[in-house]
């Protein structure tokens, strides 16, 4: 395999006021030509909110619970990542061109950057939201290991950037709120990571109903088992270990790190938590969303 060019932690690039990984920002121009199909299904999340988990669940549903079919390729090929671009790897759009319908498509884009065709075609969306504290901790470790991001510096300085929306994909607060608003006018199934952790079978049943499919109970149980954190952490078709360490260095931090709710307590100091809570209350006031920060 040819050597992948040095990714060397380029600075974020702003598009319409939203910071993005440099390569992803460059990919947005070609997204203008993207045509959604009515039977596409979009998986949308802010980063580190259970994207790969729900992608694996949906691929299992689309493959009628056939585990072997779900090992046909890495998850980023089975569920193309719309805005993805990185040196030496096919772009998300290139992968999509070879993906047969009905397609599962992943994005982290805020609505301001989402191709209008997805809304025009009334494409169904499964959105997963996770509490901000766990997202911030997970994102910090992801920044450390995924070298397409700038250097995260210290946890304290990263947390400040997260609160200010100065991380890739911008503000968590805006992301979860605007997709919540969209769910009132567009076919969006809005799920919570914490609910999925608490009762995955119940949430998978919600997804099945939303996509208009039914599966035998034993198949649903198999999906619960196959998409458990332990199984996915050991599944090379789901855990991103097939990517070059030039892109993701698992020796720094695993892509599948802990997969729990409430891990923020091991990282936040009392002072950070107080500062975060005060800022959070201002940004989330009156939005109608409430998150559990532990189970």
Curated annotation (Swiss-Prot):
It is found in: Cytoplasm. This is Sulfotransferase 1A1. Keywords: Catecholamine metabolism, Cytoplasm, Lipid metabolism, Phosphoprotein, Steroid metabolism, Transferase. Substrate binds at residues 106-108. Pfam families: Sulfotransfer_1 (PF00685). The gene is SULT1A1. It catalyses: a phenol + 3'-phosphoadenylyl sulfate = an aryl sulfate + adenosine 3',5'-bisphosphate + H(+); 17beta-estradiol + 3'-phosphoadenylyl sulfate = 17beta-estradiol 3-sulfate + adenosine 3',5'-bisphosphate + H(+); 4-ethylphenol + 3'-phosphoadenylyl sulfate = 4-ethylphenyl sulfate + adenosine 3',5'-bisphosphate + H(+); 4-nitrophenol + 3'-phosphoadenylyl sulfate = 4-nitrophenyl sulfate + adenosine 3',5'-bisphosphate. Its main location: cytoplasm. GO terms for cellular component: cytoplasm; cytosol. The modification Phosphoserine is found at residue 138. Sulfotransferase that utilizes 3'-phospho-5'-adenylyl sulfate (PAPS) as sulfonate donor to catalyze the sulfate conjugation of a wide variety of acceptor molecules bearing a hydroxyl or an amine group. Sulfonation increases the water solubility of most compounds, and therefore their renal excretion, but it can also result in bioactivation to form active metabolites. Displays broad substrate specificity for small phenolic compounds. Plays an important role in the sulfonation of endogenous molecules such as steroid hormones. Belongs to the sulfotransferase 1 family. It comes from Canis lupus familiaris (Dog). Homodimer. The active site is at residue 108. One of its GO terms (biological process) is sulfation. Its EC number is 2.8.2.1. Ubiquitously expressed in canine tissues with highest expression in male and female liver.
